[in-house]
């Protein structure tokens, strides 16, 4: 169990997390969530620790009960142009900007914060320590996983539905044999190699 997180003094807190920094294909997806203290959601945890069935149930519950939630993203072209870190920060800014309720404080999973118009704090292992960040991690993961299933339907040979774009042995093998799709991140070394650019 990770240490207890001490919340900042604020009345409206948003949690932010990202999914998809490591994959070779697709967008990096972020979510920002403001929970409603009068409508608690039981069982929020880091999305990676939950079964897919539980994640999907919580995703629906968060959509229904949260005061506000928003998704952000940075596309492969932006990742290639900016680099993955800066693209992730941009996607986080987009998620926060999309909230229908403006938070007075933002808690972000990880060790750095994007520039935001309100105070923010980075929380290491926040997805398992802060309910708002756990909720954001679930929203982002379910969204990105669904996008990978859709991409799998367009490009069935690559196995995107299984590995979600991460550089598994199978994915690397298919990348070498078939080349890159238009959705692959060209700045990532295995994709560069497949395109003969490395």
From Swiss-Prot:
Matching SUPFAM superfamilies: Ribonuclease H-like (SSF53098)
EC assignment: 3.1.26.4
Keywords: Cytoplasm, Endonuclease, Hydrolase, Manganese, Metal-binding, Nuclease
Catalysed reaction, written as an equation: Endonucleolytic cleavage to 5'-phosphomonoester
Required co-factors: Mn(2+); Mg(2+)
Subcellular location: Cytoplasm
GO MF assignments: manganese ion binding; RNA binding; RNA-DNA hybrid ribonuclease activity
Swiss-Prot/TrEMBL GO biological process terms: DNA replication, removal of RNA primer; mismatch repair
Job description of the protein: Endonuclease that specifically degrades the RNA of RNA-DNA hybrids.
Family per similarity comment: Belongs to the RNase HII family.
Protein name per UniProt: Ribonuclease HII
Taxonomic lineage from the root: Bacteria, Pseudomonadati, Pseudomonadota, Gammaproteobacteria, Enterobacterales
């Amino acid at each position: 169990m990770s240490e207890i997180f001490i919340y900042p003094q604020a009345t409206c807190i948003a949690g932010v997390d990202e999914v998809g920094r490591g994959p070779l294909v697709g967008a990096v997806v972020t979510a920002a969530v403001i929970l409603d203290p009068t409508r608690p959601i039981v069982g929020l945890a880091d999305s990676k620790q939950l079964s897919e069935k539980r994640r999907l149930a919580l995703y629906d519950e968060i959509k229904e009960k949260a005061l506000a939630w928003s998704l952000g993203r940075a596309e492969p072209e932006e990742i290639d142009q900016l680099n993955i870190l800066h693209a992730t920060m941009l996607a986080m800014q987009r998620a926060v900007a999309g909230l229908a309720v403006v938070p007075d404080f933002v808690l972000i999973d990880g060790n750095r914060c994007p520039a935001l118009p309100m105070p923010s704090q980075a929380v290491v292992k926040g997805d398992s320590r802060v309910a708002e960040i756990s909720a954001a991690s679930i929203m982002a993961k379910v969204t990105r996983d669904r996008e990978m299933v859709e991409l799998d339907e367009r490009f069935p040979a690559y196995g995107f539905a299984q590995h979600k774009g991460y550089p598994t042995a199978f994915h690397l093998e298919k990348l070498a044999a078939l080349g890159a799709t238009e959705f692959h991140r060209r700045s990532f070394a295995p994709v560069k190699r497949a395109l003969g650019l490395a």
